């Protein structure tokens, strides 16, 4: 095992030296467990997979990856494709974020309308999880949602049902309740990880608009280490 991949670690160093770290890991005379991992992303996932591979190799797992096209996580899960069907994953990781929420509360919405949006959003994910479970019969790791990087309602954003913070907290609780009731379904808690890093830095609008990364690239080792654990 490499000490560079043990907590606490230097994210910038790992990103910069990922090729040499991988080479050192592969040079180790270690027998690893092969695993096929499908990464279904709501944003760009190339470098996430690159870092995820390092942490898995360091933990004694030899991964091969299927990577969905940009933003095609739901379509791949629901309808599959020739490549994914041939791949046959041992584990599915769904990388989504606040930016993948399709419908957010508006100030003019009634409580009933907001609850309908919540229910529709949750069912969008639930039907996908159930389809994956029925198709592949393997563990599923699902990101929850980071808090919004801006608050339209200020300090009331988490208390008023019109607030996006309130909405995200409810969604995260619904995800957690589902995980508690279903085996082989796990949450990768990016809500906590983004808070530790800092929401302003995590949201990184430049990286989103330039590369469609849902979070600052330098945060990659943090959520990926969470997923591998």
Describe every region a protein language model picked out.
Residues 227-228:
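Ala/Thr-enriched low-complexity intrinsically disordered regions
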């Amino acid at each position: 095992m490499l000490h560079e991949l043990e907590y606490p670690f230097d994210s910038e160093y790992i990103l910069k030296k990922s090729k040499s770290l991988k080479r050192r890991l592969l040079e180790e005379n270690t027998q690893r467990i092969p695993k096929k991992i499908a990464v279904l992303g709501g944003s760009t996932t190339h470098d996430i997979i690159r870092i995820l591979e390092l942490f898995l190799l360091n933990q004694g797992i030899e991964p091969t990856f299927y990577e969905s096209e940009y933003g095609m996580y739901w379509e791949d899960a629901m309808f599959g494709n020739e490549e994914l069907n041939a791949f046959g994953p041992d584990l599915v990781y769904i990388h989504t974020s606040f930016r993948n929420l399709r419908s957010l509360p508006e100030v003019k919405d009634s409580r009933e309308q907001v609850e309908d949006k919540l229910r529709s959003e949750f069912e969008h994910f639930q039907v996908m999880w159930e389809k994956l479970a029925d198709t592949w019969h393997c563990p599923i790791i699902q990101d929850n949602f980071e808090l919004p990087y801006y608050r339209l309602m200020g300090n009331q954003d988490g208390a008023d049902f019109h607030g996006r913070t309130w909405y995200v907290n409810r969604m995260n609780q619904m995800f957690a309740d589902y995980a508690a009731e279903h085996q082989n379904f796990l949450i990768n808690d990016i809500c906590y990880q983004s808070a530790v890093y800092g929401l302003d830095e995590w949201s990184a609008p430049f990286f989103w608009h330039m590369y469609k990364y849902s979070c600052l690239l330098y945060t990659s080792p943090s959520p990926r280490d969470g997923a591998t654990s």
